[in-house]
């Protein structure tokens, strides 16, 4: 969804992320091999993110809260949903503007939220437990800590809106199967979906902003 705001996707088809091999910057092995490189890579991503604004799709999702109880479940690591005004966001793959203990990633005592004016981490900076501060990002091969929470939210939803995902990245792609049988499910994506899609999904073949504009006009009547 953030592509329309100018941010590149988490992983391009060629296995590169901002011209870096994913194995170097988004795996535990990459972190262990060169924490300075990984720290500076995410510093660079934060600098880019700070200069980016939410697009119309983000704003329209946030606007749904005027009439609905909305939970956003996102695979994106940026904070554009929050900046746009969404108040309940579950990040599956971590949060770019947070850092954590490299020894105990989910220990909130050692989390630190960075700000636009102070978004970089000096390589070698320690967390409260003495380990290196690392990006609060779910590296490839690591468990997705919020997946159960996300599945619960999907199972409770009367309306499920899926935006800009190929439904090929698991475990997130499996969330749609937790939807209630009578839930209204909408997919906003200009590309065809290959396999695995439920028969009761309304597919809007549009980009995030254009699709959300059309759908919000229906839902906000």
Question: What residue ranges belong to the model's regions?
Answer:
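Conserved catalytic core of sirtuin-type NAD+-dependent deacylases
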Residues: 1-221
């Amino acid at each position: 969804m953030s592509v329309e705001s100018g941010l590149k996707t988490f992983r391009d088809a060629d296995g590169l992320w901002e011209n870096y091999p994913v194995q170097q910057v988004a795996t535990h092995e990459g972190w262990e091999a060169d924490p300075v490189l990984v720290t500076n890579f995410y510093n660079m991503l934060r600098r880019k993110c700070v200069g980016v604004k939410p697009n119309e799709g983000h704003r329209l999702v946030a606007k749904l809260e005027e009439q609905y109880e909305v939970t956003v479940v996102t695979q994106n690591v940026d904070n554009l949903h929050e900046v746009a005004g969404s108040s309940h966001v579950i990040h599956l793959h971590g949060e770019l503007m947070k850092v954590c203990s490299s020894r105990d990633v989910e220990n909130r005592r050692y989390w630190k939220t960075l700000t636009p004016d102070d978004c970089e981490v000096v390589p070698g900076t320690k967390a409260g437990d003495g380990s290196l501060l690392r990006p609060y990002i779910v590296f490839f091969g690591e468990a997705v800590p919020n997946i159960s929470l996300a599945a619960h939210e999907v199972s409770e939803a009367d309306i499920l809106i899926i935006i800009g995902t190929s439904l090929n990245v698991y475990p997130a792609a499996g969330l749609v199967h937790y939807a209630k049988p009578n839930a209204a499910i909408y997919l906003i994506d200009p590309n065809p979906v290959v396999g695995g899609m439920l028969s009761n999904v309304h597919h809007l073949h549009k980009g995030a902003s254009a699709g959300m504009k059309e759908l919000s006009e229906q839902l906000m009547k």
